[in-house]
Regions:
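Forkhead-associated
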Residues: 3-5, 12-69
Length: 69
């Protein structure tokens, strides 16, 4: 099972077990993973899990989406 680790400046803020196929990420409360930070768009990105692979799609967020960065 995939796992998403949310960190800031090397400090782990949250960990999520990714058991579903799709997760929305953003600042608004209707997202599966909510990040309450002004640099995160309301509907920021989408995580898609297919078999043993995970894909991250930016949803035209203002500040972009980065992996390991």
């Amino acid at each position: 099972m995939a796992r998403l680790i949310l960190s800031l400046d090397g400090q782990v803020l949250a960990e999520y077990n990714m058991s579903k196929e799709r997760y929305t990420v953003g600042r608004l409360p209707d997202n599966d993973i909510r990040i309450d930070n002004p640099t995160v768009s309301g509907h920021h990105s989408l995580v898609i899990n297919i078999l043993n692979d995970s894909f991250l799609e930016d949803l035209n967020s203002t500040n972009g989406t980065y992996v390991n960065g």
